């Protein structure tokens, strides 16, 4: 997948400009190698939809999603309202914000899982370890139900 710096192939990373960009132009940028996602078509649409919500609801400033949240429940609701954010992504982003970026809202620490999550991953090595652990857990679950 492409990194944010590689997405600069557009020449900008501004939510308003991305939201307003012709979808075909944005899709072409998302498909350039390395692609943004293994499904660049659906991800291009999701990114543009997300940018449109950030512009409409947060003035184009994504950090307002968490800086203006009043507590953990409000943060979860704000994240869950974003296009493409299901329950798992909401939990992951909340862990990331709390553990890696120091966001500290009432009730947030109590929502943190005791086990490692994707939101705890900081390096490629940690990602490989995390993914191996997930694969092993899935294999054990399949074996137990067989």
Language-model segments: which ranges?
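A positional/architectural concept
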Residues: 1-11, 16
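C-terminal accessory module of base-excision DNA glycosylases/AP lyases that mediates lesion recognition
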Residues: 72-81, 87-146
């Amino acid at each position: 997948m492409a990194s944010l710096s590689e997405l600069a192939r557009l020449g900008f990373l501004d939510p308003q400009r991305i939201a307003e960009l012709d979808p075909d132009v944005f899709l072409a940028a998302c498909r350039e190698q390395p692609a943004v996602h293994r499904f660049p078509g659906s991800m291009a649409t999701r990114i543009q939809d997300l940018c449109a919500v950030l512009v409409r609801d947060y003035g184009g400033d994504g950090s307002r999603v968490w800086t203006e949240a009043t507590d953990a429940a409000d943060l979860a609701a704000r994240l869950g309202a974003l296009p493409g954010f299901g329950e798992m992504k909401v939990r992951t982003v909340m862990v990331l914000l709390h553990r890696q970026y120091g966001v500290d809202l009432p009730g947030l620490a109590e929502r943190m899982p005791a086990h490692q999550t994707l939101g705890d991953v900081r390096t490629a090595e940690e990602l490989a370890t995390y993914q191996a652990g997930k694969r092993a857990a899935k294999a054990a679950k399949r074996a137990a139900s067989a």
